[in-house]
Amino acid sequence: MNVKEHVISLPRRVFVGHDIVYDISIYFSQLGVTPPFLIVTGTKYTKKIADKVIENLPKDAKYEVVEIDSATLDDVYMVEEVIKRISPSLLLGIGGGKVIDVTKYAAFRNSLEFVSIPTSPSHDGITSPFASIKGLQKPVSVKAKEPLAIIADIEILSLSPRRLINAGIGDTIGKIIAVRDWKLAAKLRGEYYGDYTASLALMSAKHAFQCTKIINKDIKYGVRMLMEALISSGVAMGMAGSTRPASGSEHLFAHAVELIHPEGILHGELVGLGTIIMAYLHGINWKIIRNRLKKIGFPVKAKDLGLSDEEVIKALTIAHTIRPERYTILGDRGLTWSSAEKIARVTKIID
């Protein structure tokens, strides 16, 4: 790779354990961060977690809270208004993917550090220096700030809705496809391929695959395994300086569906469906992936997510246009309507 400089953006510390939010003041002391803090959180369950974090901040710490319920540019602007007013030294993102995406993007735009405190293991954005923000030109990830630290409290994460946990598994297993697509682009287009970062992403996928054997028996152990996989995937992106190790044709399909059917479906759920479909195209055993996901209660049919056959087929035909510079198994021309329909039926995504 003939570039003058390659910057690797990684978290300084990762704290994983049980009931560790009660030790947040100790962690902040270790990190050398001081008030004032700006806390970004959700409006419902995550706000309760944020309140617990606030109770354990350093004594007399000055802070302000912003509550959001989406990840749009308007939400980012709302956070930035408070940044201008209180000049915080640190942002804390306490919530799910939307909260953390808004926090890291606002931190990036304002040259601030941020700490990621996820309340659900729904996708690998808890670690990565990229964010998905609605209101931009396309539904793809944009450059954002990597977290200074991650505080992953397994007690909190294991209480998140099972649907969110399953979505995290779907998102992470998708790295199997992303790495295959990356290899294909290197072979056919001469694109740079990073063996180490690809191996790290693939290891994350395999770890999540193993998680499907455990999660029904031991939720806390399974969630810890999943968190390790999500963190590793985010680190792979930070090392690569792009989302390439973690986002391929399975994500293009997910983004295409999000354009057609923008509400009510979790990102990781769509990535899981996309992984089954793209595994078929790559000649990978898609049946094993489908069966493993089905056993944990993952929705493996489009209708389970409220998607029509036509929406799935259309998404498959336009997926290659979402990010044309990123070569995948879909090629430059994508799939015809008839071939997309055939593949969706063969993989049992549609009946």
UniProtKB/Swiss-Prot annotation:
KW Repeat (keyword) present: no
Stored InterPro entries: G1P_dehydrogenase_arc (IPR023002), G1PDH (IPR032837), Glycerol_DH (IPR016205)
Reaction(s) catalysed by this chain's protein: sn-glycerol 1-phosphate + NAD(+) = dihydroxyacetone phosphate + NADH + H(+); sn-glycerol 1-phosphate + NADP(+) = dihydroxyacetone phosphate + NADPH + H(+)
Required cofactor(s): Zn(2+)
Enzyme class label: oxidoreductase
Pathway terms, separated by semicolons: Membrane lipid metabolism; glycerophospholipid metabolism
One Gene Ontology term from the biological process aspect of the record: phospholipid biosynthetic process
Positions bound to NAD(+): 97-101, 119-122, 128
Annotated cofactor note: Binds 1 zinc ion per subunit.
Subcellular location: Cytoplasm
Enzyme Commission number(s) of this protein: 1.1.1.261
Residues annotated to bind substrate: 124, 171, 255
Chain positions recorded as Zn(2+) binding sites: 171, 251, 267
Molecular function as annotated in GO: glycerol-1-phosphate dehydrogenase (NAD+) activity; glycerol-1-phosphate dehydrogenase (NADP+) activity; metal ion binding
Keywords: Cytoplasm, Lipid biosynthesis, Lipid metabolism, Metal-binding, NAD, NADP, Oxidoreductase, Phospholipid biosynthesis, Phospholipid metabolism, Zinc
Chief location category: cytoplasm
Listed CDD domains: Gro1PDH
A Pfam cross-reference name: Fe-ADH_2
Cited NCBIfam families: PRK00843.1
HAMAP family: G1P_dehydrogenase_A
Assembly and interaction partners: Homodimer.
Family: Belongs to the glycerol-1-phosphate dehydrogenase family.
Name of the featured protein: Glycerol-1-phosphate dehydrogenase [NAD(P)+]
